[in-house]
């Protein structure tokens, strides 16, 4: 028996709705539960928020943690599978979820998250960053570094889209930039920005923009 998650989109032109269905065997929660019956304590933890709907040129990519398939939803309302994972998340214990980050015409930035949490150390949900190269048809582990630092400083490639040009953004506290500037860790444009900051300055917003690219 298969289940499916149902979402709807609403037309801005005439207000009509269309249902979107993503099939899967059973709904899987991302939460890890904790209970202490003697103390009457019950709570759960979940990993960081992940974007289930990601803009991709004139389409949208749909991710459901209970499904083994990632879909591209087109403007003509066709839903096309673009990634099929194996082994099935339905067969894993603990489950390892697959989430997508920034998408380009060549690369898919992805992340796996293991449904595992230690309530004593308050650590868990270990992750692995993966990159799929559509041209080479290969998957790699990856790290993206910020070239405005003299040392290796990783950039989070999670999708936080602003519009079709800005794929994601990150906030950097002014105090952290001032400290890095004084220690000589900055260069290029970020060094120039940090030189003008003080402790009362607002955080600096770093934008991750798409290069000009054609629809894949």
Language-model region placement:
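Short, small-residue-biased leader/transition segments that mark boundaries at the very start
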Residues: 1-5
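Beta-propeller blade signature
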Residues: 6-15, 67-72, 123-137, 197-209
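Surface-exposed loop and turn segments in beta-propeller and other repeat-based domains
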Residues: 15-44, 80-96, 139-156
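Structural signature of eukaryotic scaffold interfaces centered on beta-propeller domains
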Residues: 31-58, 97-109, 156-164
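Short consensus segments that form the blades of beta-propeller domains
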Residues: 60-61, 118-123, 194-198
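Conserved beta-strand positions in repeat-built beta-propeller and related beta-rich domains
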Residues: 62-65, 112
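Loop/turn-rich, solvent-exposed surfaces of beta-rich toroidal or solenoidal domains
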Residues: 95-164, 172-173
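Blade-level signature of beta-propeller repeat domains, shared across WD40, Kelch, NHL, RCC1
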Residues: 163-216
